[in-house]
C-alpha cells in the first residue's frame, strides 16, 4: 500500500508571529538565553506550552511545540543575519551584498562608486525584527546616506585648465542611528564637513571627501564597540546577580544549619540535666534504702539464731523413757 503524503501546513501568519514575540518578551527571563540562567527545565517547558496554547487559539491549523520553537529559531537567525551584515560592512569597510529578501539590486547596494570610498548599504529592520533584535540584545547600526546635490561645473570664457573650479552647494552627509537593547536607547550622530569656499579646485574637493568618510567610519566603529561593551556589561551584571543569589542561598543554608546545631545543643543540655537529676534521685534512693537493708539483715539474722538453742522433743521423750523404766 502506498503511504499517503503528508499534507503541508500553512505558514505562520503575522498574528501568530506577533503572539510568539509578545510571549517571549513577557517570558524572556525564562526562555531567552542570556536571561534564563539557572531556570529549571520544567519552568521552561511550561512557558513554551503556554505560548503554544496562545498560538493555537488564533491559528487556522493546529500547531505543535517543535513548529513554534522552529519558527522562533528562524526569526532569530534572520535578525542576526542582518545585524551581521551591518557589522561586516562597518568593520571591513565593505557594503553588504544584496539578499533574496532585500532584492537583487537597487539604490544603496553594491560597491561604492567614485573616489569618495565605499558607502555602507542601509539595512532596514521591520518593527517586528527590531523587537526581536532588542529581545536578543543585538546592537544594530543602520547607516542611511542622505541625498547629494552637486551642481555642474561652471567655467567662464576666460578660465583655463589649471584654474578650473567647481561650485558645490551641498556636501554629502551621513547620519548613523544606533539602537541598543533594553533602554531602548537611540541616539543619532551626524557629521557634516565644513563648507568649501565658492572656488575650490577639484583635487581638494576629492581629498576633503576622503577625509570626511574616515571619521564617520571611525565613529560607527566606536559606536559598535560601545554597544558590544554595554552588552557584555549587561551579561556580566546578570552573572553577578546570579552569583549574589547563590551566595544568599548559601548564607540561608548556613543559618539553617547553625539553628539546627543550636537546637541540638539545647537538646543535649536538657538530656544532660535530666541525666544529672536521675543520678541525684538514684543516690538519694540508695541512701534511704541503706538503713532499711541493714535493719532487714539484722532481722533475718535474729530469726535464724533464736531456734538453735531449743531442745528436740524426741530426745526429751527418749530421755523420759529410761526415767520411767528405771522407776
Curated annotation (Swiss-Prot):
Record carries keyword rRNA-binding: no
Gene Ontology biological process terms, A to Z: negative regulation of cell growth; regulation of mitochondrial membrane permeability involved in apoptotic process
Localisation per UniProt entry: Nucleus
GO (cellular component) term, any one: nucleus
Location of region: Required for nuclear localization and apoptosis-inducing activity: 1-70
Composition skew (Polar residues), residue ranges: 316-327
Highest taxon listed in the record's lineage: Eukaryota
Record's compositionally biased regions (Gly residues): 104-118
Compositionally biased intervals (Low complexity): 87-98
Tissue distribution: Widely expressed.
Xref: Pfam families: Myb_DNA-bind_5
Keyword vocabulary terms for this entry: Apoptosis, Nucleus
Spans annotated as Disordered: 87-118, 303-327
Role noted for this protein: Induces apoptosis.
Self-association and partners: Interacts with HARBI1.
Recorded family membership: Belongs to the NAIF1 family.
Protein name: Nuclear apoptosis-inducing factor 1
Originating organism: Homo sapiens
